[in-house]
Structures are given as structure tokens and as C-alpha cells.
């Protein structure tokens, strides 16, 4: 079975279709990069699953790393997941991407000091047009939640009697109740 055919099977699977739309889109993008990567003058997608070796998977990973280590790690993860589906469905015998070691990435996080947070909030609250941004940022900071989750809060999410806010976290889909 060709890798292209295996991926079509994965895209029609229950496993894939139960993912969030954003995750499906990201997987399709990253798997597309994997399938289009040329090794030995052929796209990997045109190769038979049984003919893709660990060496080839490592060579493909090195090619992806030339575009960025973070991208390469995402492509590797999506490829592993999709080919593992093939293993479970007995469509292929091995997953050559499992033996590829990921390269580390430098964290993209910038940690603000309390003074920087205070300066940001002071600036936001001093201007009428940016006060809403300040409020969203302060709630995210105080409750350790994602900015996007704060942005979609509604008044009905606040229970003033119980003095708590109800938040549905977008990443984990968890529902949390935080004191206000």
C-alpha cells in the first residue's frame, strides 16, 4: 500500500474525524509536507509503506529541519500518528518514523516581570479604546488562563452569587470554575 493511500484511509477514519477542525487542518498540512518530501527523486507519498525505512524517515526529518525544527517536529508527530493508525488497522507493518529522534527547540516564551505587567495594564486602562484588552489580559494573568478563553467569556459565565467564573478551556476542553 502506498503512503498516499494509507493517508486517505486515515483521513476517512473515525480517529481522524473525531479531532477538532483546527487539529484536522494542522494534521492535513503537516502530513502533506511529509507526503510531498522527495527522497531518491520520489515523493514519499508515492512509496510503498513497506519500502519506507527508518533511514529514509531520518533523511526526511533532516530535510524538514532545514525549514525549521518546530515545523519538523510537528510533521514528525503527525506522521507518527497517521502511520500508527495504519499499524493498528494492519495496513502496514512498521512505523519508520518512531525511531527518529526529535531535535530540541528553544522555548518561544517570554516571561514578563510584575513591573512589565503593571506597566502594560496601566497603559491599557489609561486609554478608553484599549481598556477591554487590558481587562482580558488581566483576567488571563490573574487566573492563569489563555487569552483566547478570556476573550470569549460572556456575562452568563459569571456567577455573582457563588463568586466564581465558569470557563471552558479551548485546548483541553475542560470546564473550570474559578473564584472571582
For the regions a language model picked out, list residue spans one by one:
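A short, basic/aromatic helix-end/turn motif that makes direct DNA contacts
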Residues: 152-158
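Basic, Lys/Arg- and aromatic-enriched nucleic-acid-binding interface segment
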Residues: 69, 73-75, 88, 92, ...
Amino acid at each position: 500500500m502506498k503512503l498516499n493511500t494509507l493517508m486517505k484511509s486515515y483521513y476517512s477514519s473515525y480517529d481522524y474525524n473525531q479531532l477538532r477542525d483546527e487539529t484536522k487542518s494542522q494534521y492535513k498540512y503537516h502530513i502533506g509536507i511529509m507526503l510531498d518530501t522527495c527522497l531518491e527523486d520520489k515523493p514519499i507519498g508515492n512509496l510503498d509503506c513497506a519500502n519506507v525505512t527508518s533511514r529514509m524517515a531520518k533523511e526526511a526529518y533532516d530535510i524538514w529541519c532545514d525549514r525549521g525544527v518546530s515545523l519538523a517536529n510537528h510533521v514528525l508527530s503527525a506522521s507518527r500518528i497517521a502511520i500508527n493508525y495504519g499499524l493498528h488497522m494492519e495496513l502496514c507493518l512498521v512505523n519508520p518514523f518512531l525511531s527518529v529522534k526529535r531535535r530540541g527547540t528553544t522555548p518561544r516564551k517570554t516571561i514578563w516581570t510584575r513591573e512589565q505587567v503593571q506597566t502594560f495594564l496601566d497603559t491599557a486602562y489609561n486609554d478608553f479604546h484599549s481598556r477591554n484588552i487590558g481587562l482580558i489580559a488581566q483576567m488571563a494573568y490573574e487566573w492563569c488562563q489563555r487569552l483566547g478563553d478570556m476573550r470569549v467569556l460572556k456575562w452568563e459565565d459569571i456567577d455573582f452569587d457563588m463568586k466564581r467564573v465558569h470557563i471552558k478551556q479551548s485546548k483541553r476542553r475542560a470546564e473550570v470554575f474559578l473564584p472571582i
